[in-house]
Design a protein with these regions (language model features):
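Extended, helix-rich architectural segments
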Residues: 1-325, 329-337, 391, 401, ...
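Terminal, low-complexity, charged helical segments
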Residues: 3, 13-16, 105-112, 119, ...
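Short acidic (Asp/Glu) and glycine-rich catalytic loops that position anionic groups and cofactors
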Residues: 96-101, 349-360, 428-438, 478-487, ...
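Generic, well-ordered alpha-helical scaffold segments in large soluble proteins
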Residues: 121, 125-128, 369-389, 414, ...
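Long, highly charged low-complexity segments enriched in Glu/Asp and Lys/Arg with interspersed Ser/Thr
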Residues: 579-615
Length: 640
């Protein structure tokens, strides 16, 4: 028997009983609260990206006030020029123009045909989940917050049982704050806060009428903060005002807290020398799987007269296993569902990537240029204020020049009138004539400062004018312009490759889920092309190990044009037939023309008159008397 306390789940059940979920909730809440700074930074970055750039708070006379309100109180207009949005759009354009997709390669070269099959199946699953759009939006999230999360799961959606991918909003996600490995391999706890309708809740967790009544009773009080506070205080976990983790913003929704964390228990690691399998088993199964099997092999060896030292026995060793265990919890500490990870990849369903995560710190792409954006907005607002405050068209009118019968108001009205005439009294000697004063106070260096900030903006972000598609200066060569765009792309290479590694990690879990849950033969077809129809056989592919790589997509117009040109050259040199040209090429008329050619061939083989053949040749075909006529018709079909 294992020592008491080795099995963490069994120990919690024994010592805490029905209250053990509160310990899990408390730990999850601490991780969620530890990400409060990240959530605030993300909100600030998002505000600057989408134009809300005067929402920072400043302290004036001991009172916190938003910058926008302060500027308005001073009688100014809080102007802004959103450069960050343009920068983010440029990087998103670069990402979409790459048009990359994950492909599978079998580690065993003899199983490479299975790698091609899995690549097709993976592409079909990506089309099902609209991954092109999901990854683009995840890339935007990655630029804004520096942290992106997806959830890979298997189940029912829209009456379809399949492998699904969901975007996870980082504000609803929490993770072990002790993690320092930027690969995420030292993570010990992850989770997500779900706000779902009561109908979705029952569809997921209610198996019968009793479950429905239990859920209705639980969530009847989930909107009452005082009831929640009293519940947690009774069990020694005071909330101290932190209700956001337990109470949804929309009180019509039902909150479910999903927690995945590492648990431990003693297990036995086995190595079957007979077939090379390495596996682990529970202590309770050791007798049946290892001891009895080894005794059986020894008995058979004795019956055959073999030496016991030559018998391939199952080798084993005792060890403490650290495994992923999940909890589906209510805000009141009810466990809706729990268990060891059901996935054969033996991990949690989440895929996440933080950037750059050196020493556990997250610094997003947008955060690097917020100071330049703020200073640019400040210069623009200051420029506008100076222009409005400077003297423009002020009339200096000496009192000695004021004629009889006119007041200064009359002079002002006449001055502002189109084609107005102002009469003046002849001034005395030394008295100046009325004159207009215009003071140009704008040339104080603001334009130079603004241009310098715009240049800093491009230098810091690495997104220059060439990358944004701006025209070059007069006389710039095309090679220099292309080189500038290439240099800018190089500065973004680390960011793009980091996101590609995130896509690869997600594709790896997709492949593992497909191998596990696609347990019946299926036929897959991508975009209706006959050449990409594959049959998925789970018996052959289930145990194949695949390497994944991110390569250029074959669905881009440039790739299709290159393929068509190569096929046309091969066809002109009679290296391939017209049927092969139409099958492997990408022509808008390929399917119809190929079907027509096959139909004509069948008519020829049956001795019928195909369309498009001269009457003389048709008569010879019908008589089936001239073999050269058949050959001539075949040549006509190949030349068409």
């Amino acid at each position: 028997m294992p020592h008491e306390g080795m099995d963490s789940v069994a120990t919690a059940k024994h010592t805490l009983g029905g209250n053990r979920a509160f310990e899990v909730l408390w730990q999850a809440q601490q991780y969620w609260l530890a990400m409060d700074t990240f959530r605030r930074d993300r909100e600030r970055n998002k505000n600057y990206t989408y134009g809300r750039q005067w929402d920072d708070y400043v302290c004036v006379n001991g009172r916190k006030i938003r910058e926008e309100e302060l500027i308005k109180k001073q009688g100014n207009v809080p102007l802004k020029n959103n450069l960050i949005r343009r920068m983010v759009q440029a990087v998103l354009g670069i990402y979409r123009s790459q048009a990359k997709e994950p492909t599978c390669t079998a580690r065993d070269r003899d199983e490479q045909r299975y790698g091609e099959t899995m690549s097709t199946v993976l592409q079909c699953n990506m089309q099902l989940n609209r991954m092109t759009e999901i990854n683009a939006r995840c890339m935007e999230e990655f630029l804004i917050s520096g942290f992106v999360v997806q959830r890979k799961w298997y189940g029912w959606r829209e009456n379809k049982l399949d492998c699904w991918t969901d975007y996870v909003q980082p504000n609803n996600f929490f993770i072990d704050n002790n993690m320092k490995d930027f690969r995420g391999w030292d993570c010990s706890c992850v989770g997500e806060v779900h706000d779902i309708s009561f109908e979705e809740l029952c569809g997921r967790f209610a198996k019968d009428g009793n479950d429905y009544n239990r859920l209705a009773e639980i969530y009847k009080f989930a909107k009452d903060k005082s009831y929640l506070s009293a519940t947690f205080d009774n069990f020694g976990y005071p909330l101290q005002g932190y209700y956001d983790f337990l109470v949804p913003y929309d009180t019509s929704r039902c909150r479910v807290i999903e927690v995945w964390r590492k648990e431990s228990k003693p297990r036995v690691r086995c190595h079957d020398v007979n077939n090379g399998d390495v596996f682990k088993i529970d202590i309770e199964d050791f007798q049946a799987i290892v001891t009895d099997e080894n005794n059986k092999r020894l008995q058979e060896a004795r019956e055959l007269g073999m030496d016991e030292s030559d018998v391939p026995l199952i080798r084993w060793e005792w060890f403490m296993d650290s495994y992923w265990y999940y909890y589906m919890l209510t805000p009141f500490g009810d466990i809706l569902e729990e268990g060891e990870t059901p996935y054969e990849h033996k991990s949690h369903p989440y895929v996440f990537k933080a950037y750059p995560f050196i020493d556990g710190e997250i610094h997003s792409f947008v955060s690097n240029v917020i100071d330049q954006q703020r200073y640019t907005n400040r210069l623009i607002t200051m420029y506008d204020w100076i222009m409005r405050a400077s003297a423009k068209g002020v009339l200096l009118f000496p009192e000695d020049c004021l004629p009889k019968g006119m007041s200064m108001d009359d002079v002002a009205d006449e001055w502002a009138r189109f084609n107005g005439i102002i009469m003046i009294r002849t001034p005395k000697a030394g008295t100046p004539l009325p004159q207009q004063i215009a003071n140009n106070c704008t040339q104080i260096g603001i334009s130079e400062l603004l241009n310098m900030q715009l240049k800093f903006f491009e230098d810091i972000s690495g997104v220059n004018g060439a990358l944004q598609g701006k025209p070059g200066y007069s006389g710039m060569s095309a090679s220099l312009y292309n080189q500038q765009a290439q240099n800018a792309s190089t500065s973004l290479l680390d960011l793009l490759d980091t996101f590609s590694s995130f896509v690869k990690e997600g594709a790896y879990k997709d492949v593992k889920n497909i191998q596990q849950f696609y347990d019946t033969p299926r036929v897959f077809n991508i975009a209706g092309k006959n050449s990409t129809i594959v049959e998925y056989d789970p018996k052959k592919i289930r145990d194949v190990e695949f390497d994944l790589s991110i390569v250029e997509s074959t669905a881009t117009p440039a790739y299709r044009a290159l393929t068509n040109d190569m096929l046309m050259q091969l066809w002109e040199k009679n290296a391939i037939s017209v049927e092969q040209l139409l099958e492997h090429g990408d022509f808008p008329f390929a399917d119809e023309l190929l079907q027509s050619i096959k139909s004509q061939r069948e008519q020829l083989e049956q001795g019928k008159v195909p369309d498009g053949i001269s009457p003389e040749l048709a008569q010879q075909v019908q008589q089936n008397a001239n073999a050269s006529a058949m050959q001539q018709a075949q040549q006509m079909l190949q030349a068409s």
